Every structure is written in C-alpha cells, then in structure tokens.
Curated annotation (Swiss-Prot):
Pfam families: TPR_12 (PF13424), TPR_8 (PF13181). TPR repeats lie at residues 28-61, 68-101, 109-149, 165-198, 208-241, 248-281, 283-308, 379-412, 419-452, 907-940. Transmembrane segments: none annotated. GO terms for molecular function: histone binding. Keywords: Chromatin regulator, Chromosome, DNA damage, DNA repair, Leucine-rich repeat, Nucleus, Repeat, TPR repeat. GO terms for biological process: DNA repair; epigenetic regulation of gene expression; meristem structural organization; response to DNA damage checkpoint signaling. This is Protein TONSOKU. Residues 587-597 have a biased composition (Polar residues). LRR repeats lie at residues 302-325, 564-587, 739-767, 856-879, 995-1019, 1079-1102, 1245-1269. It comes from Citrus unshiu. The keyword Lipid biosynthesis does not apply. Belongs to the Tonsoku family. It comes from the Eukaryota. Changing Q72N: Slightly reduced interaction with histone H3.1.
C-alpha cells in the first residue's frame, strides 16, 4: 500500500500541475491514472469521479480519439459497480469511436468489455436470452480480432497474446453457462496450453482466470481433485500479483468445493478468508454480503447434517425393531415407519448434496416398497434413484431408473408419474448432449400432462421445450409460440403460482452438484425432497385408510396392490406449494470482472422474446425483469426452483402498450440507457382521435360501433369512449378532459402557442344532457354529440410539452396530457401511470427545463431508469429554485442505486429535498452509502420511503448511523425488505427516538422479535407517533396489546394503526375495545387477515356504537366474521357518525354454510335493536336447521332441499321494493330476510362513503338490492359502484373506490 500511496501522491501532484498550466491533455491523462489506481484498490465510486473528470475534460477540450481510454475506463468501473446500463453506454461509445478510428486494438477491447457486461447481465437476469446472444456475439468478435492482431501485430512489442488467451477464457465460461461442460473444458485447457507454448509468466492474471474457470468446470463434473488443484492455483497467482478481489473469489470457490463434499469446517475457513479480503476493499459490499450469506448457508447445512445423523440412528432402531416384527401383525407398520424415515433422510441428503447417501437411501426405499407390495411407492423409489444418478452425473444409469419408473407408472395407470418421468428423462438426455431426444421426451411429457389435466407438469414440460427451442436449437418462432402457451397457462393458474413467492434469500437449487450448478434453463418436474413429503403424506393416507388391515399378513396385499395407486397423491400438489428451500447452496460470484465467470452458473426458466431481432440490443428487455426466488420444488430438475415474481411492474417486458390513447402498438423504445431516440410513427399521432372539418374521417383501427363523434365549434372529433366507462356509467369528467386535450392538439399553431386549453362544460345528445352511457350506446357512430366550451384555462407546461414533442418528432402521450390538464397547480407535476420510459419522458423533462419551477414531481408507476435521473439532475442543477421544498416521488419504476448517486451529486437537492419516495425500485444494498449521504446532507428531508427496495440489514444500519439529533425526518417506510435483522431494526428505533419531529413509521412485512417489539413500545411511549404500520410483522395478540398500551400511555394525537395479518384473536380485540384511549385515539384501523371471528365482530360493533369513537377507516377483510358478523357491524353504523370507509371483503368462508350464518342472524342479529351489552351470539345447532349452503361455483346464494322448508320469516324493511322477495321464490326465505336486513342496515349507514363487500358469495340479485339501498341513503349524494364478478365496491362520487393505488395514498 505504501507504493500505492506514493503513486497516488505523485499522480495528484502531476494532475494539479497540469490543471494549473491549462494542459488539458495531461490533465485528462493524470485524472485517468488516479482513477486507475483507485479502481485497482477496489474504490470504485471514488475512481468513477476521477474517470468522469477525465471524460469531461476530453469531451470539452480534446479530439475525439482521446475519449477512447476514458470510455473504456468508465465502462469497466460501471461494470464492477454492476451498473450495467451505464456500462453499456460507455462501452458502446468506446466501440463506435474505435470503429471510426479503424483501431482494431480498441475494437477488440471494447468487444471484450461488452461481452463481459452482457454475460454478467445474463447471470443476474435468469431469463434474458438477448444478453447471452450479445455476449456470444461480442466474445466471438473479440476472439477473431485478437487472432487477427496476434497474427499481424501492430508493433513488435504487442503480440496481443494476452487478449487471445482471455478470449478462450471468455468463450469457455460462456459454454459452461450453456451446460456445454466438455466444450468449455476443451477451450479453457487450450487457453492454458497457449500460455505454456508462448511461455507466458506463471503469475500472469490470464492464467488465474483460466484456472478459476477450470476449477468450476471440474467441480460441475464432480472431479474434486482436479477442481481443487485449479482453484488453489488461481488463489496462489492472485495472491502473488496482489489481486485481492480475485483471491477472495478464489476462496469462495474453494469454500464451495468443500461445501459440496460436506467438509463444512474447511468451507467456513475459506469463506472467512474471502470475507476478510472483501472487507479490506472499499466498494465490495456486495461481495462481502454474499460471503456472509454463504457462511450462514453452511451453518444451516451443519444443522441439517446433525439432523440427518439423528435420523440415521432412528432408522437403525427401526431396522432392529423390524427383526422382532417380522411375520407378525406389526410387520407392515414397521415397514411404513422405515419408509417414512427414509423419506426424511432422502430429503435431508438432497438439501446438502450428499448424493451418494441419497442413492443409498433411495435403494433402501426401493427394497421397503417391494416388501410393502406397493407399486406406487416402488415407482416413486425408482424416480428417486434416477435422480441420485443424475446428480452423480451417471446419466446412463439415471435413464435406466427413470425408464423403470415410467414403465411402473404406466403399468398402474398413473399418468402424472409417467409425465414426470418423461420430463426427467428429457433433462438427463439434454445434459448428456442428446438435445433432440430431450426435446422428444419433453414433448411426450407435455402430451401426457395435458391428457391427465396436470397444469403444473404441463408448465414444467413447456418451459423445458421452450428452453430446448431457444437455447439448443435457436428456434425463435417456436420458442415464441411456446412462450405464449406458458403465459396462458400461468395466467390460468395464477393463484397456484402465488405459492412460489418465497423468501428471497434462500439459495437456488440450481447451484447444486452435478447438473444443479450448471446454466440449464430446464424446469424440473420430479423431485426427491418434496417427494419425501408427498410420499410421506401418501403413506399416512394409506395407513389411515387401511388401519384396520395393518394386522393382515403382507401376502394379502399382493392381491390388492393394483388398487393402491389410486390412493396416490399427486407430487405436483406438494411441488407447487414449497414452504422453504430444500437445498442449501452457497452463492458464488464471478471471480473478476476481467472476463471471468461466476463460480457457478444458474439455470433459467425461459426467455422473454420481443419482435426486435436486430442487433439484439435489448437493454430494454430488462424493464420487465422477472425476479426469481430459488426454491427446491423438485430435486431432479434444476431450473424449476426458480419461480417467477414480478417485482417492479405489473406489465410484462414483451407486452408494453403505446403511450398515447390509441390501442395501436408503436415501436418499443430502444433502451433506457441509450442516448439515441427512437421516434414514434408520425401517422395518426393521437391514436383514437382525428380532427376534420365538415367531414368525419375514421381511423383505420377504430371500429364504428365503438366510436362517438363530437362536434366542438365547426370541428368534428371522433374517439373511443370505452376507457371512460365503468359499469355502464360514463365518467363524464374523464371524457371532457380527453376531448379538451384532443381539441387543443388540432388547433392552429398560433392558438396552440398561447397555451390556452378549452374548458368543456356541456355535452348534449339529441337535446339531452349526456349523463348515462345507456342513453346513446345504441347510436354510437351514427349521431353527433354537441360539445360547448365554457372558457379557456392557461396550461403553460402542457404547451411546452407539446412543443418539445414536435421538436423530437414524438407523439404526445395522451395519458400524460390528461394528467397535466387536470393539474390544479403548475408547480406540482403529477404524471404517474403514463407508461413513460427513459426516452418517451424526454419531451417532458425538456419542457421542465424551460418551465423551471417545480415543487412536486411525481413520476411513479412508470418504466423509468437511471437515464431519467441523470436528466433530472441536470434539470435541478439548472433550476433557479434553491429554497422551495421539493417532493420527489419515484416509486414503482426501474431506478437502481445510481439514482441515489445522482441525487448525491446534486447540491441543489441538499437544500430542497423534503420528500423522497423510492419504494418498489430495486436499489439493493449498493445504495447504502448514498442513502447515508442523503440523510446527512438533505437538511429539510422529512419523509423517506424505501419500502420493497431489496435492501437488507446492512443498508438499514447505514440509515440508522446517518440519523442525528438534528435530523428533520418525520416519516420513514422500510417495510417489505429482507433480510432485516432484529439488531438493525432496534438500532434504527433507538436513533428514531432521538428525533424531535418523528411521527410516522412503516415496518410492514418485517418480522419483529420480542426485543424489537419492546424497543418499539419504548418509541411509542416517548414519540408522538401518528402513523404506525405493522402489517405482516408476526406481532401476535400479546405484542399488539403491549404496543397499543404503550401507544396510548399518555396524551396522544389520533393514530392510524395497521395490525393486519399479525395473528390477532378475538380476545385481543375485546381488550382493545375496552380501552377508553383506543376508542377516541384511533382514526384508521386495519385488522385485515386476523382471525377475529364473530366474537371479535361483537367487540368492534360495540366500539362503533360508542359515542366517543372517532374511527374514519376500518379494514376487516379476511377476518372470518361470517355473514352474521358482517351484518352486525353494518347495523352498528346506524349509531356511528364518523366512519367513512369500511372493508368487509372475504369474510364468508367457503367451507361454512350459509345456514350457519343465517341461523346466527335469526337467533340474534335480526332483532330490532342491537344493545351494546349483547354478548357473543348463541351457538346454533345446525342439525336442527336447514341445510342451506352457499353455492360457490356460481357465486350465488342458493338453498338446498331441507326438512325445515316449512320455516318462514316475514319480510321486513317495508321501505324497500319487493324485488328480492319476488326473485327468491325458489330460495329459502332466510336468504331474502338476510339480504333485506343487510339492505336496511346499509340504508341507515349515512356517514359511510366507501363499503367493500367483495368475495362474500352474494348473488347478482342480492348485489342489486344492496346497491339500491346504498344509493337511496338520504344525503349520500351521487353514488358509485364497482361490481365485477365477486368484486363489490360501493362508494360516493367524491370518494370513488380504487381511484388511488394503496402505495400512492397521501396522508
């Protein structure tokens, strides 16, 4: 380090001297040298600053050729920081400059860097085929250029040998990612041979890379000794050349090698050495974090190994007992116990990759199944044995046992088993190089799965077929067709696939032994770990059903064995609902960004295709990034553990719509990091509206019977109005806004330049005011609606935006225009949900540059990335505002950690930024230091939201460290991040306790331990908290009670409290409502997802009827209240003057009969008045009542035949019409009585503005009756309904349901 410091000192001295002299070339050169020294130290952020100085000086003062080295340096540093989009910008510029200069040397370097970047993107995306294509393209180009330069060196000093060797390394690691291990081994060995032939130094870094990757290849081939030899050689070289990052990653690989062979102590020692090296480098937080996770994984594996040893002892005991039970009535029971024990051992051995043991246990299971005469268990055991041999890379034996399994399943008619076996055979054939045979097997498995109606196995087979066509055969058209099939199947099974959303920190089974760790995109259909549960569960079922037969001799089962498979449970039922990771795999990272690969490849499911087949330039493909949660669902196939979670947007990458109001697709933007803009098609710019004079022209994509023609003055405007219709009601205001925007766009230039937009006042059809869609829906496209303008309003920003669109030849975004039109304050720019991307937002940002003044900028729910933030930074710097507080809402976009770096580089924001919302962006722990800087320097920042940003304890701790007593922070949201430890949260709470103005805290989704709850209670006592969001925190009844007591232990402002999904019970609710302070201290209360039952409804009804109750919002969805509880709560509102919103969705369980609810209603809730002192309703003997059941298939209320049909109840609520009674002649009077009682209660709930009754099984007629009651309430004003299938929302005009996303609600 002494030499480094001396070099740094000399370089800085030379830089200062060159700057003072005005020698720009030397100034840039020395800035680059300083950056290079810092880069080699691992101080990438600091290096980036110096490389940018080099870049800025070169751009301003030097010829273009001087940009070559600085673009190369910037690209490399951004790559090391994993800012891939930024890296691609400079690397592509580097390549362009090199081509312009005809410089083959620089072209080769640029191609190598581009290949590395796309390769790293592929490793992290798991579904980005464009990246792997680009990686292949650039690596092959780099190798050709290196070979050309080697054969024809530019100078005698430069042979380009090093680059030629690196090219072998790069393509070798790429082949390893594609599961072509033999080809990869051949290339890497050839690289070492070239080193020896050309007498390259033994300590050359090129050799270290080759050794590194060869170590990985041999590890996948289970050639442990050779793997260790190459990994250790890699470490030795890196140590000699002082390449700490490479040395650390070498130790990571060595640790994984020890882990694979169950040498856990040695593994931890290696990981600890790697951790020490990573921590000694400045900007290697991600590497250190990864190593920490690996150490934790090894510790868990040690626990599993201990459990396995205990279970082995149990199996030995059971085996001894079997000797005694042989020939007795206990023989079968003893065999079943051994089978269950072996299932457990198979599961645990697969978790720690002990495949030899796994094979041993599987064979013992086969023997037990034979003795049990159970063909179902026998076929299962064949499947597990096949898996063992597959993981041991004995593919011929694996095929043999999978074939046996398939034949056995076929003999007993088990279609599911046949399908699973076929898909597994395909996996083995693919690994063995028989790609055509693999595809045939996948197709056969799919055919069987379709025949048996097994959606999950169909999905697995389709994904494997997609992989084969895309990766193996490069058949894009067929892959696209299969992708469409996959999407349709996933959409139809969306509820089942939700079970795949598991902890993000579990390690992927794809990083396993044998095929596990290979870059295979194939999905898995068969498994061992989950089979153990499935099989164990099936054994219990068999045992339960045949318990009386356990004493029969085993010979008797030879006759009955053919019927046993009928009791067999489907594997896939278990497979699709994994609860925890089945295999514990340390994650390996790429050894170095210098053309090296990760320690282990990943499997991928499938590739998202778009129509772009050009340069395969698909940074855009990242915008719908599908994040995978690694889970052991099926042990035999590797890729099926990667399940899909859509993290950032609701819109898939290949399914973006055009940004104007037309339904016509336009060109998808090129890239978020591109600096070249793609213009939209200029024809029909405004999509669904065309201006004409005297004659109507209809756009070719517009259907006559879906269009309406409007006349404004002498102009006719035709547009589709379906976007303004909800439940047969026309949203008149939305229609007026769209008409105003369209009319303005067709005005002459001189009028547009004034920025005056029309105010649409009246719309008339046939002389009548337009109020209902029914009034004219039959005349669409035939008659003209007259529109009158009541005045004009100035919209300067809108005018500027349209001008900037014209300058860039871009079509204005209609959604954005409407947002700007309805904005009441010019300084508040709200353009959320406008489908904006880094390119399409450019006209707006250019308009803001001219507009200058902005107090609030809301860009949420778009598709924006770091490129937008760079432009925003330039806007804020150039803005003349320095003192006005700024609200910056960027949530739910595609921003990364660099976004925060841009904020840190903008001094203006230090004095202005008051609110910063970044939730829903994948910031990762790379943002930690930037967040810390923002919190320390932004003096007026009072609200920070980093919810669901993929950050961990490391970042939370940095946030805590950055908070000082002088901080103005009042609101903090950190929920739904993982993993966050209790210590990190506790440290944060301690710091928050020191803040003078802190009042709002959101910890939703974080698991809170007892010490954290205690610390939180202390904060509640000492701070004036007004918002406390604790949903899904596992608080429990005791923790919640403790917290509420602390919260109201002193005079307290009204509080908004979220305790949803915290495991609260009805007793807890009783204690809550007994608290006087709670009655008048809570404004909003969310108890959704807690099983408070009918008893809890009683307590809450008493709370609502209390005159001191000040609740405005009450959420009770999924609280198991039953229909009786729903009715009781709504009845209680007749005595409540404050509640405005009530959510009672999902409270009628499908497993409970309507009769039980209605009986309860009949016994208590249909009484004329509800007393505060009423206790829990009496239990009703359902045997004495009718068998009235809820028909959940048709979502209607129907009553089955019953002996008690003679029971009738007189119709009540005379104020309502007889529609219910007349339509229910065929149904029980209980149903009609209940609906009329509920309608009557709704009619009495006068202050209520929003009511959610979704998913409670109400029939269509019942909903109409309920809405009639809602709309007939006195003083309610105009009402609104949102009814679709089982969605039932009643609201009023000023408080429409679903108008704002939950994440966008402002306090």
């Amino acid at each position: 380090m002494g030499r480094d410091e001396m070099q740094m000192s000399e370089a800085k001295r030379a830089y200062r001297s060159a700057k003072e002299e005005g020698n720009r070339q030397e100034e840039a050169r020395w800035a680059n040298v300083i950056g290079d020294i810092l880069k080699n130290r691992g101080e990438y952020v600091e290096a980036l600053k110096w490389f940018r100085i080099d870049y800025d000086v070169s751009v301003k003062y030097l010829p273009e050729k001087h940009l070559l080295p600085t673009c190369q340096s910037l690209g490399e540093v951004y790559l090391r920081l994993e800012h891939f989009k930024d890296a691609l910008i400079y690397q592509k510029k580097h390549l362009e400059l090199a081509k312009d200069a005809s410089d083959l040397v620089e072209q080769q370097r640029a191609c190598t860097q581009l290949g590395r970047t796309y390769y790293e993107m592929f490793l992290r995306s798991d579904d980005d085929h464009y990246s792997i294509r680009n990686a292949k393209k650039y690596f092959k180009s780099a190798m050709k250029l290196a070979q050309t330069l080697k054969e024809n060196p530019a100078t005698s000093r430069s042979s380009f040998l090093k680059e030629y060797i690196d090219a072998h390394n790069n393509i070798g690691m790429l082949q390893m990612e594609l599961d072509n291990l033999e080809e990869a081994k051949k290339l890497l060995i050839r690289g070492l041979e070239i080193c020896n032939e050309e007498e390259v130094s033994e300590d050359d870094d090129g050799r270290s890379r080759l050794h590194h990757n060869l170590g990985n290849v041999y590890m996948e081939l289970r050639m442990w000794d050779k793997s260790r030899e190459h990994i250790e050689q890699d470490i030795i070289i890196c140590k000699k050349i002082e390449h700490r990052q490479g040395e650390a990653k070498g130790y990571i690989n060595l640790g994984e090698l020890h882990y694979r062979v169950q040498k856990y102590d040695e593994a931890i020692l290696c990981y600890q050495k790697a951790l020490n090296l990573a921590q000694s480098m400045e900007d290697e937080d991600a590497l250190a974090s990864q190593i920490d996770q690996n150490i934790e994984t090894v510790k868990k594996a040690i626990e599993v190994m201990d459990e396995l040893k205990k279970e082995e002892q149990n199996l030995k005991k059971l085996t001894r007992n079997m000797i005694i039970a042989k020939g007795t009535s206990q023989e079968r029971k003893s065999l079943l116990q051994q089978n269950a024990s072996l299932d457990c051992l198979i599961e645990k051995s697969s978790m720690i990759f002990a495949w030899l043991k796994h094979c041993e246990y599987a064979k013992r299971k086969k023997r037990i199944a034979s003795e049990l005469c159970d063909k179902g268990k026998l076929s299962d055991s064949f499947l597990v044995i096949g898996e063992s041999y597959q993981k041991l890379r004995k593919f011929n034996k694996a095929i043999k046992w999978y074939t046996k399994s398939w034949e056995m399943y076929k003999s007993i008619g088990n279609l599911e088993g046949q399908a699973l076996a076929k898909v597994n055979m395909g996996n083995v054939l693919d690994s063995n190089g028989d790609w055509a045979g693999a595809l045939d097997a996948f197709q056969e498995g799919y055919r069987i799965a379709v025949e048996a109606n097994l959606p999950s196995v169909q999905l697995s087979a389709l994904e494997n077929m997609h992989y084969s066509h895309m990766i193996r055969f490069d058949n894009i058209e067929e892959a696209r067709r299969l992708q469409h099939e996959i999407d349709k199947l996933k959409e139809s099974k969306s509820e089942d696939l939700e079970a795949y959303d598991v902890a993000k920190d579990c390690c992927s089974e794809t990083d396993t032994e044998g095929n596990d760790h290979l870059p295979d995109v194939r999905s898995s259909a068969c498994f061992s770990a989950e089979m153990s549960k499935s099989d164990s569960g099936r054994s219990k079922t068999l045992a339960g059903l045949e318990e009386v037969e356990d004493d029969e001799p085993l010979i008797s089962f030879l006759r009955s064995s053919e019927r046993l498979p009928k009791l067999k449970r489907a594997y896939v039922e278990k497979q699709n609902i994994p609860t925890e990771p089945r295999e514990l795999t340390p994650k390996t990272l790429s050894k170095s960004t210098n053309s090296q690969q990760t320690g282990g490849g990943r499997k991928r499911i499938r590739v998202v295709l778009s129509d772009d087949e050009g340069d395969i330039d698909n940074e855009e493909g990242l915008k719908g990034r599908l994040q995978k949660c690694p889970v052991e669902g099926v042990a035999t196939f590797d890729a099926s553990r990667w399940f899909i979670l859509l993290v950032w947007q609701d819109v898939p990458a290949a399914d973006f719509k055009c940004t104007n109001s037309s339904e016509n697709p336009i060109n998808v933007e090129e890239s978020t990091c591109s600096h070249k803009f793609t213009s939209s098609n200029p024809t029909n710019q405004y999509g669904n509206a065309i201006r004409c004079t005297g004659k109507v022209f209809i756009a070719s994509d517009v259907n006559d019977d879906q269009c309406v023609t409007f006349r404004i003055d002498d102009d006719l405007i035709q547009l589709e109005v379906h976007s303004c219709i909800c439940d047969d009601k026309l949203d008149i205001e939305s229609l007026k806004v769209e008409l105003a925007c369209l009319y303005y766009l067709q005005l002459p230039k001189e009028k547009i330049s004034k920025g005056l937009l029309p105010i649409i006042q009246h719309m008339k059809y046939g002389g009548r005011s337009l109020e209902s869609f029914d009034a004219f829906k039959d005349q669409l496209g035939k008659d003209i609606i007259e529109v009158s303008i009541d005045g004009w309003v100035q919209k300067r920003l809108m005018k500027l935006y349209i001008e900037c669109c014209k300058e860039l030849s871009e079509a204005p975004n209609m959604k954005l225009l409407k947002k700007l039109y309805i904005s009441e304050v010019e300084d508040e720019v709200v353009v959320s949900e406008c489908e904006l991307q880094d390119i399409s937002v450019t006209p707006l940002l250019n308009a803001l540059q001219t507009h200058k003044t902005v107090a609030m900028l809301d860009l949420s729910h778009n598709l924006l990335g770091n490129g937008t933030m760079e432009k925003l930074q330039q806007f804020f710097i150039s803005s003349c505002q320095n003192y006005v507080d700024l609200t910056l809402d960027l949530h739910c976009n595609r921003f990364g950690p660099t976004t925060l770096f841009q904020i840190c580089e903008c001094p203006v924001l230090f004095t202005r930024l008051g609110v910063l919302n970044l939730s829903g962006n994948r910031l990762t722990d790379a943002c930690g230091s930037y967040l810390s800087t923002i919190l320390k320097n932004c003096k007026v920042l009072y609200s920070l939201n980093i919810e669901n940003c993929s950050i961990t304890s490391r970042t939370i701790q940095k946030v805590a460290d950055a908070l000082g007593a002088e901080s103005t922070l009042a609101q903090l949201c950190i929920g739904y991040n993982s993993p966050v430890t209790g210590n990190a949260i506790t440290n944060l709470l301690v710091k928050l306790d020191t803040l003078k103005s802190f009042s709002e805290l959101n910890l939703n989704g974080l698991k809170l331990s007892k010490p954290v709850v205690d610390r939180l209670c202390q904060l509640a006592k000492t701070s004036c908290l007004t918002h406390l969001m604790l949903g899904c925190t596992n608080l429990g009844s005791d923790g919640s009670l403790q917290l509420v007591e602390s919260l109201f232990s002193r005079a307290q402002e009204s509080v908004k409290l979220d305790l949803s999904y915290c495991g609260l019970e009805s007793t807890c609710i009783h204690k809550f409502t007994a608290s006087v302070s709670l009655v008048h201290g809570i404004l909003e209360l969310n108890l959704g997802g807690n099983p408070i039952m009918k008893e809890g409804a009683n307590a809450l009804a008493s709370l609502l009827m209390n005159p001191q109750c000040c609740l405005k919002v009450l959420v009770l969805s999924k609280c198991q209240l039953g229909l009786a509880g729903v009715l009781q709560l709504i009845k209680a509102l007749s005595e409540n003057d404050t509640l405005e919103e009530l959510n009672l969705a999902d409270n009628a369980s499908k497993e409970l009969t309507l009769q039980q609810n209605l009986s309860s209603v009949n016994s208590e809730n249909l009484q004329p008045a509800l007393k505060t002192s009423d206790g829990v309703s009496k239990e009703v003997d359902t045997d004495q009542q009718g068998l009235c059941a809820m028909n959940t298939d048709c979502n209607d209320l129907e009553v089955a035949d019953s002996e008690d049909d003679k029971i009738r109840v007189e119709s009540a609520a005379s104020g309502f019409d007889n529609s219910c009674t007349s339509s229910c002649q065929k149904n029980s009077s209980f149903e009609c009585q209940f609906i009329q009682e509920l309608s009557s209660a709704i009619g009495m709930a006068k202050p209520l503005q929003l009511l959610d009754l979704s998913n409670n099984g109400f029939s269509t007629q019942a909903v109409k009756t309920l809405y009639s009651a809602w709309s007939s309430r006195s003083g309610a004003g105009p009402t609104w309904k949102h009814i679709k299938e089982q969605i039932i929302h009643f609201s009023v005009e000023g408080n429409k349901c679903c108008r704002v996303k939950p994440c966008c609600r402002k306090n």
